[in-house]
């Protein structure tokens, strides 16, 4: 088993300027998305590098605004009601994938209107580039020691002791005394072994989904299909990994005694993705390749 290193949140300090790991991960995510989108544009007659620059700008804006607003609405709504200014306290952290996803969709919709494309022409073009952002984001979560997984006694070598979870571990120990045999002391704090669910998500929602989507979209597919595969891939991955991820402290299990907020938000993505995929192939409209209607 491993002990989380408790990395310094500052990745690089240049005099008074401090670059935090999480900010660096966002920078890498946007830079990688731009590079991949630029490459894809070189393979498409109806996309230019200027359009890619605009697209990434709209996407970045959607991620940041949507991610923050979504986090506050989905996970901290009570705090927002009591203190509306909490929405602006971005320095305290808090981003939601599902909120960022909605923000990106809105950004892509505005982009599509500007360049007279359909929304799904834009979505299908950019979705293969999105999982790399999820990959870097989850690595950032791991470095920060946040969004850790559930306690496990499985004895797996990769289980991790997160000192950041010490206070929560003590609460779990009080309600489950049988966990006593698993506890160890780290820097004066008593912690339990947990699944490094951030890395599970980085691997499944990030690396694996990127590889599959990149391959899938490298050949002509009907309009809407790539977007549908993304929804299915992310939704299924997130739904499964939520069984290993510790539910948010202030949320817990919100449905049926086992379903988390992440699963509740991912289920509609799975359903929508399946419906869209069936519809896309049934309709059979192609935007490039021999079957495209120019």
Curated annotation (Swiss-Prot):
GO biological process terms on file: lipoprotein biosynthetic process
InterPro entries, sorted: Lgt
Keywords: Cell inner membrane, Cell membrane, Membrane, Transferase, Transmembrane, Transmembrane helix
Keyword Transmembrane: yes
TM ranges: 10-30, 55-75, 91-111, 119-139, 196-216, 224-244, 258-278
Lineage top rank: taxon: Bacteria
Protein's pathway: Protein modification; lipoprotein biosynthesis (diacylglyceryl transfer)
This enzyme's EC code(s): 2.5.1.145
Subcellular location: Cell inner membrane
Cysteine disulfide links: none
UniProt key word Endoplasmic reticulum: no
Residue positions binding a 1,2-diacyl-sn-glycero-3-phospho-(1'-sn-glycerol): 138
One Pfam match: LGT
Membrane-related topology note: Multi-pass membrane protein
Gene Ontology MF terms: phosphatidylglycerol-prolipoprotein diacylglyceryl transferase activity
Gene Ontology cellular component list: plasma membrane
Family: Belongs to the Lgt family.
NCBIfam families documented for this protein: lgt
Chain's role: Catalyzes the transfer of the diacylglyceryl group from phosphatidylglycerol to the sulfhydryl group of the N-terminal cysteine of a prolipoprotein, the first step in the formation of mature lipoproteins.
Protein name, UniProt field: Phosphatidylglycerol--prolipoprotein diacylglyceryl transferase
Species per Swiss-Prot/TrEMBL record: Psychrobacter arcticus (strain DSM 17307 / VKM B-2377 / 273-4)
